[in-house]
């Protein structure tokens, strides 16, 4: 590689790094993810996303206007062949506090899940419960997970297609027991950016042999759908994500979310909402391919 190529590659990476740091910083600010004095438990699986999250959090920590701690935690689920030395060695090079939590959830998953069935659901529940308990043990105030924008959009479609629910992943949530706050600092980051970032940083990626190789997973088909959309219509994934941020309960059909039964009439004839809707429709570039031809039905 000549000097011109090297200079160009460095420039592109610097732009990528700034974009990712800006996206993480904006997500943290928008959802008040990290506050003064927080102890952030960064959950590191060994995948590209959690490595990138840790790296960006540590960089933001140096320049943040508030003081907070970052503690790296890995859950060793006792998968056969798992390289136990990689993460401790990596954390040592960073000179940061870390813990390796030993919990044989692998055997439980293999015992409970029939052959050929997806293991991700039970695996994630067991992992989540263990991490919640450990966070309390070390006094962590926030649990940081490495889910990104693509994960959030994929989850929404998974719930729509296979659960008949309009539900995704929130950037910040309180656990069911009310004792933990989970944050997703990569909420505004695209997976394709994280892939490039991880390649350049040469993180010691550890593949998940328990579930990552199951190509027939429902999530994989949805991921492929989004990748195809990205190629044909750049920006569509971002637009879908923005729609998750801009919900109009009265324009859906959930009777628990909006009181359709007792819908009051506006006797004053206020047409502001209707006029706004008309303005939006008239000023929006509508993708005509999304319409259905009903003339021959």
From Swiss-Prot:
Look up the record and report any one GO term of the cellular component aspect: cytoplasm
Gene3D superfamilies per UniProt: HUPs
Instruction: Quote the InterPro entries the UniProt record gives.
Output: Rossmann-like_a/b/a_fold, TilS/TtcA_N, tRNA_Cyd_32_2_STrfase, tRNA_thiolation_TtcA_Ctu1
Q: Which UniProt keywords apply?
A: 4Fe-4S, ATP-binding, Cytoplasm, Iron, Iron-sulfur, Magnesium, Metal-binding, Nucleotide-binding, RNA-binding, Transferase, tRNA processing, tRNA-binding
Q: Name one GO biological process term.
A: tRNA thio-modification
What are the names of the required cofactors?
A: Mg(2+); [4Fe-4S] cluster
Q: Pfam families, per this entry?
A: ATP_bind_3
Sequence motif PP-loop motif, location on chain = 45-50
Superkingdom of the organism of origin = Bacteria
Which reactions fall under this protein's catalytic activity? Answer: cytidine(32) in tRNA + S-sulfanyl-L-cysteinyl-[cysteine desulfurase] + AH2 + ATP = 2-thiocytidine(32) in tRNA + L-cysteinyl-[cysteine desulfurase] + A + AMP + diphosphate + H(+)
Residues annotated as binding [4Fe-4S] cluster are: 120, 123, 211
**Record localization:** Cytoplasm
Recorded metabolic or biological pathway in which this protein acts: tRNA modification
Name the SUPFAM superfamilies on file.
Adenine nucleotide alpha hydrolases-like (SSF52402)
Cofactor note as given: Binds 1 [4Fe-4S] cluster per subunit. The cluster is chelated by three Cys residues, the fourth Fe has a free coordination site that may bind a sulfur atom transferred from the persulfide of IscS.
User: Could you say which enzyme class this protein belongs to?
Assistant: transferase
State which Enzyme Commission number(s) the record gives: 2.8.1.-
Q: What does this protein do?
A: Catalyzes the ATP-dependent 2-thiolation of cytidine in position 32 of tRNA, to form 2-thiocytidine (s(2)C32). The sulfur atoms are provided by the cysteine/cysteine desulfurase (IscS) system.
Q: Which family does it belong to?
A: Belongs to the TtcA family.
According to the record's subunit comment, the protein's assembly and interactions are: Homodimer.
- What else does the entry mention about this protein? The thiolation reaction likely consists of two steps: a first activation step by ATP to form an adenylated intermediate of the target base of tRNA, and a second nucleophilic substitution step of the sulfur (S) atom supplied by the hydrosulfide attached to the Fe-S cluster.
PANTHER family named among the record's database cross-references: AMINOTRAN_5 DOMAIN-CONTAINING PROTEIN, SULFURTRANSFERASE-RELATED
Q: What protein name applies here? A: tRNA-cytidine(32) 2-sulfurtransferase
- Species in which this protein is naturally found: Vibrio campbellii (strain ATCC BAA-1116)
